[in-house]
Regions:
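A Zn2+-metalloprotease active-site environment signal
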Residues: 2-287
């Protein structure tokens, strides 16, 4: 899903709620951006987000995501592959997103200001993603080939939203830039240069960015909790990945799984965390 734009009108809106020198730069960056930890009432345990992300300005990486998302939609529209507002599958996706979005802000206070958007692109790809800044896209292939239930769609969407909320792209950009670029960004944050050069150049990389296994595990668990709080059955996380494994076997491997490693270990982690969020799911279903 994560092979990786600000429009004037959003399709969705939020429903409501190291060496000494480098250490110095990290401290300065950390002071510029508040620590991103798990919400106090979180049921899953994912710890604090990577401090490395503070070396890349959040607003710059979000702006890059918004720009690339807009370019992707324009390309799809030119090929008559962008679903219209009346498309039943798109309406379904947006309805699911409306249930998930209210639970996003506790995981990242910046999400309160994001102009959330969901779109559907006609493609056989088994894929979906959420850009920094809350820009979500699904490909028809993931819905049609896997025949996803609403609960399974919510698990996919929650997982992708979690990547954006936990700022995995921002952290990966900082880590892949190397020490020299990191020091340069740190200097910029200290007022010694133009801020955001790296993030401004990073837009073309967001759509193909690969996350680490720890990022994927974190997204699985945060997405699981988001979906459970929104009233989606957490057991669907297991059925989703079983479907993904079957599809990969039948098709000789999926490009999707190159960035979303599958296997028994992943399912085992989800199964171990389902009991932690089942009460959230039951409460949501009662309300």
């Amino acid at each position: 899903m994560c092979t990786r734009c600000e429009s004037s009108t959003s399709a969705l809106s939020p429903a409501s709620p190291w060496q000494p020198r480098r250490a110095f730069l990290l401290a300065a960056a950390g002071a510029a951006t508040a620590a991103l930890g798990a919400p106090a009432l979180a049921q899953v345990n994912v710890g604090n987000a990577s401090v490395a992300r503070n070396l890349v300005p959040a607003d710059k990486i979000e702006a890059a995501g918004v720009q690339q998302y807009g370019q992707l939609l324009a390309q799809a529209r030119a090929k008559n592959a962008l679903a219209g507002d009346n498309n039943a599958q798109l309406q379904r996706l947006r309805a699911i997103a409306q249930r998930l979005i209210p639970f996003a802000t506790p995981w990242n206070t910046r999400a309160r200001e994001w102009k959330w958007e969901v779109n559907l692109i006609g493609s056989k790809q088994i894929n979906a993603f959420c850009m920094p800044g809350g820009k979500i896209a699904f490909f028809t292939g993931i819905l049609e080939q896997l025949k996803l239930s609403d609960d399974e769609v919510a698990m996919v969407m929650g997982h992708e939203m979690a990547h954006a909320l936990r700022e995995h792209a921002r952290a990966r950009m900082a880590k892949s830039a190397g020490t020299g670029a990191a020091l340069s960004i740190g200097a910029q944050l200290l007022g010694l240069g133009q801020v955001g050069d790296l993030a401004a150049r990073a837009g073309t990389q967001l759509i193909t960015l690969k996350f680490s296994r720890s990022d994927e595990t974190e997204a699985d668990l945060v997405g699981l909790e988001l979906a459970a709080r929104a009233g989606f059955d957490p057991k669907a996380s297991v059925s989703l990945w079983n479907k993904m494994a079957t599809a990969s076997k039948n098709q000789g491997g999926l490009s999707f799984l190159s960035t979303h490693p599958s296997g028994t270990d992943r399912i085992a982690k989800l199964e171990a965390n389902i009991p932690k969020v089942e009460s959230l799911y039951r409460n949501a279903k009662r309300s």
